[in-house]
Amino acid sequence: DTGISGRTAVIVGERLYSVARSRQVLSITHLPQIAAFADCHLFVEKHSDSEKTKTSLRELNNAERSAELARIMGASAADESAQKYASELIESANRFKLKVNELD
């Protein structure tokens, strides 16, 4: 998703969702417009000490999903408008998915 943003990123998210309806899709993105279409968000964390680097993976709940989308937009955890926009992105993606599924 390098070099895209805005409406183009939303279209990519819609297309990825269309593919994901019949196949498993694993996507790594820093675009909230694409991430909003995910059915499941996994958060990757790295922990390093002087000898090793460990990577952990955990599934985010709904509140964490919105917070993470706001974070990748560059907002702080206290930024209510970014949190609201992140929630709206997820809601919009869910409406799109519901509409597509109703067509079946």
Residue ranges, per PLM feature:
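C-terminal lobe/lid and adjacent interdomain/linker elements of RecA-like ASCE P-loop ATPase modules
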Residues: 7-104
